[in-house]
């Protein structure tokens, strides 16, 4: 039986420390603190429909055309490129408007591209905290 060698995970590259609130693990303390603020607003009725880690598809997966299998059934084509998705930290409704929120420490280039694609594809402007 082969065992996988486990690699030691050192400290986070951007010094973010994971935090646990209400049994939920957050990627940073800043995100956990924002969750507590939003949870309090939801309890007061200022916002509704608070969700975490909501996935938005920006570019769907790219596949080769469907093929006919040996028994005549349709078989999905070979995957060429995986989908490109943006995962929002928080999504909620405030004053009848959907708000998509992201807590950011460092604004990396891939995030900036995904932010622009969110506006282009879904017409949603991300609120950065």
Describe each PLM feature range.
Residues 1-129:
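Electrostatic, structured charged patches in enzyme active sites and in nucleic-acid/phosphate-binding
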């Amino acid at each position: 039986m082969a065992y996988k060698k486990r690699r030691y995970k050192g400290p986070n590259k951007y010094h973010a420390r994971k935090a646990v609130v209400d049994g939920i693990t957050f990627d940073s303390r800043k995100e956990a603190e924002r969750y507590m603020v939003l949870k309090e607003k939801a309890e007061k009725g200022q916002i509704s429909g608070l969700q975490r880690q909501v996935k938005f598809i920006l570019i769907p997966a790219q596949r080769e055309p469907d093929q006919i299998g040996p028994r005549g059934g349709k078989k999905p084509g070979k995957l060429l490129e995986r989908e490109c998705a943006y995962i929002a930290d928080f999504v909620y409704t405030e004053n009848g408007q959907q708000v998509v929120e992201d807590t950011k420490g460092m604004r990396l280039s891939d995030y900036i591209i995904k932010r622009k694609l969110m506006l282009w594809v879904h017409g949603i402007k991300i609120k950065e905290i």
